[in-house]
Amino acid sequence: MKLPKSFRLFGKPWTIKRRKLKESGNCCHYKAEVQLDPRKTSSGQIKTTLLHEVVHAIEGDMDIKISEKDVNRISVGLYAWMKDNPKVVKWLLKN
């Protein structure tokens, strides 16, 4: 499946870019952009990396402080929960 090019957070559009980075991913609040380096992640890891950067985007937009260790724990935990419970995720997203 192809990497999405964008997402919305609190009604604001964000872009997803592929970039050469020092780390696997980066969240750039002033550009409303998540940057991912696919060279540094497997196909499964890129999903958790994207979710990790989205948690950083939420952190910035809600003006909260979460340690990098906890951002990682939250993103990995949410991804595992979504993967294990697709019916619940589908139910949550129904209008």
Over which residues does each language-model region extend?
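Metalloprotease/metallohydrolase-associated module, dominated by Zn2+-dependent proteases
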Residues: 1-45, 61-95
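Active-site recognition of the HExxH zinc-binding catalytic motif
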Residues: 48-60
